């Protein structure tokens, strides 16, 4: 057998076991753990390459081969960092393994035939599409912005640029829920709606769940009282949906202990659990220590930088309909912004105590920066804290798995959609993001939605080849016409699906139901299940984890920043 140098092999087929890859311009390095292709039998498309008739491509009919194969991909997911071919059929992941022609090649698990399209993933990283669970539906254009960043599923609420939606992620009542489901039917992303959970009697909540929401949002701007919390969780337990909480910053109806008592050990998703985005001041951060609390962050506090504090005050005044000329409004805003808890938040993410990241889109958060900021935190923590104790080699594999889980599998588990999305696993919707390593986390090379390319960078349309500048992200065929209805999912509650909501509203997209929302616990949060004892000093706001002071220095320079956005 002929030999090839490791560098030449990587140049031709991408990295293999033992090779290391740097993520963008961060200090994060991953090492390939396994290679599911077969050395000497790799498939590659192009002139003089393998995927040709009678060679890597067989004679089987469409029923017996995949629709799409991503060749020689470096998969980065919560379950591993693995080199493999990825086969897609009928919009779902068919197999992860070895592609080729089973008539002449060994170990083939992904048959290639005349019906198979190829995406060349040699030298590329492939991740699952991101999931953003904190969406204010202020404008529909957020969907394309999110898709360009690598987010393919959006969970939240709202009705457009109304005061209520500027502040809260609630789509209130059956009429608005129906209209928003119809509007979202044409968006190129998966969606799930949250209803308004702020009532103390259950019938107004039940009718929203029956209308189609997959969760209820309790927000202090509508009154996050213990009675409302208890009522929403009671209905959630009854109808198997999730509850998301933005708790009472002003401590008017109780303190964090009262909110935890009202929750009563039941599963709940706490938004921006550090507190700058809202929640009991100054100690809502302590909630993430509890086994039933699924804590997330929104991205304006991630990572902690020199500008974080100054930026927040103006954001908060605008989003929560506050008046800078009213002293009480200013005091309310200032009570939420604490250097000490923001500095601790990054460390809690690195420890795996905070489980999810999200945006808070146009409402104190940036919809296109969930993925980017998650990796900036990972970089900052690598630089400040060094290698994690869980690492087993000279790489950052465990840290990378911890951080990618925060915006993929963990939000999917939290909201009962992990059976459909959230990871690169057989049977799940083929929502896949292809990255060049140098642009990882910043600018995808291709975003695949339900098996079709939905958006990608594209050069001059009148050029003789697709690459000449100016290059812009443009919607592709998977995001157009009736095709998008086959490539996306609308998530509904089980009650709504059983009641025929999709048929009554003439929704054209595929429907999936949420399930398992009430049994998921902090222990189920992949690589992010730590439940330490957390205390906050009421005077200094210092945060201690198991008695140890935790903090971080504000960054003055970040990777994945200006140098990537000069063009």
From Swiss-Prot:
Pathway: Nitrogen metabolism; urea degradation; CO(2) and NH(3) from urea (urease route): step 1/1. Carboxylation allows a single lysine to coordinate two nickel ions. Changing residue 320 to N/Q: Reduces activity 100000-fold, but increases KM only 3-fold. The keyword Metal-binding applies. The modification N6-carboxylysine is found at residue 217. It catalyses: urea + 2 H2O + H(+) = hydrogencarbonate + 2 NH4(+). Changing residue 221 to N: Reduces activity 50-fold. Substrate binds at residue 219. Its main location: cytoplasm. Optimum pH is 7.75. Changing residue 320 to A: Reduces activity 100000-fold, but increases KM only 3-fold; optimum pH is 6.75. Resistant to inactivation by diethylpyrocarbonate and iodoacetamide. GO terms for biological process: urea catabolic process. One of its GO terms (cellular component) is cytoplasm. Its cofactor is Ni cation. Coiled coil: none annotated. Belongs to the metallo-dependent hydrolases superfamily. Urease alpha subunit family. NCBIfam families: PRK13206.1, PRK13207.1, urease_alph. This is Urease subunit alpha. It comes from Klebsiella aerogenes (Enterobacter aerogenes).
């Amino acid at each position: 057998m002929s030999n090839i140098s490791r560098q030449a092999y990587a140049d031709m087929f991408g990295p293999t076991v033992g090779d290391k890859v740097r993520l963008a311009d961060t200090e994060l390095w991953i090492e390939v753990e396994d290679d599911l292709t077969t050395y000497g039998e790799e498939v590659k498309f192009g002139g003089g390459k393998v995927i040709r008739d009678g060679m890597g491509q067989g004679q089987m009919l469409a029923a017996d081969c995949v629709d799409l194969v991503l060749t020689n991909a470096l998969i980065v997911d919560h379950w591993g960092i693995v080199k493999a071919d990825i086969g897609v059929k009928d919009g779902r992941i068919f197999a992860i393994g070895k592609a080729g022609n089973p008539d002449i090649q060994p170990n083939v698990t992904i048959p290639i035939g005349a019906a198979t399209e190829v995406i060349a993933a040699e030298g590329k990283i492939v991740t699952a599409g991101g999931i953003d669970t904190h969406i204010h539906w202020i404008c529909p254009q957020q969907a394309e912005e999110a898709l360009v960043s690598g987010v393919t599923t959006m969970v939240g609420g709202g009705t457009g640029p109304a005061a209520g939606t500027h502040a809260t992620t609630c789509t209130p009542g059956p009429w608005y829920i129906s209209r928003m489901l119809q509007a979202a039917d044409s968006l190129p992303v998966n969606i799930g709606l949250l209803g308004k959970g702020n009532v103390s009697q259950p019938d107004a909540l039940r009718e929203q769940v029956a209308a189609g929401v997959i969760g209820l949002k309790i927000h202090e701007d509508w009154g996050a009282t213990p009675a409302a919390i208890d009522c929403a969780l009671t209905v959630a337990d009854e109808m198997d949906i999730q509850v998301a909480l933005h708790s009472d910053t002003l401590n008017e109806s109780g303190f964090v202990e009262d909110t935890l008592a009202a929750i009563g050990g039941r599963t709940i998703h706490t938004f921006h659990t550090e507190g700058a985005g809202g929640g009991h001041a100054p100690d809502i951060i302590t909630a993430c220590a509890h086994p039933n609390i699924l804590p997330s962050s929104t991205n304006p506090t991630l990572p902690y930088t020199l500008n974080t504090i100054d930026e927040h005050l103006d954001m908060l005044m605008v989003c929560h309909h506050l008046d800078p000329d009213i002293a009480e409004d200013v005091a309310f805003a200032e009570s939420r912004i604490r250097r000490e808890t923001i500095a601790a938040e990054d460390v809690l993410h690195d420890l795996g105590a905070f489980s999810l990241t999200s945006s808070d889109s146009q409402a104190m958060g940036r919809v296109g920066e969930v993925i980017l900021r998650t990796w900036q935190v990972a970089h900052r923590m690598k630089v400040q804290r060094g290698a994690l104790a869980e690492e087993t080699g000279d790489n950052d594999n465990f840290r990378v798995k911890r951080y990618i889980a925060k915006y993929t599998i963990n939000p999917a588990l939290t909201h009962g959609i992990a059976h459909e999305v959230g990871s690169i696993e057989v049977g799940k919707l083929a929502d896949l993001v292809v990255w060049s390593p140098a642009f990882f986390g910043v600018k995808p090379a291709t975003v695949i939605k339900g098996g079709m390319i939905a958006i990608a960078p594209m050069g001059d349309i009148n050029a003789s080849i697709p690459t000449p500048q100016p290059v812009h992200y443009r919607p592709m065929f998977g995001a157009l016409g009736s095709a998008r209805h086959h490539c996306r999912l609308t998530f509904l509650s089980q009650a709504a699906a059983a009641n025929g909501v999709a048929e009554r509203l003439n929704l054209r997209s595929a429907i999936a139901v949420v399930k398992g929302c009430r049994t998921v616990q902090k222990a189920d949060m992949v690589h992010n299940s730590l439940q330490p004892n957390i205390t906050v000093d009421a005077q200094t706001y210092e945060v201690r984890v198991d008695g140890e002071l935790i903090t971080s220095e504000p960054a003055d320079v970040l990777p994945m920043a200006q140098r990537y956005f000069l063009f």
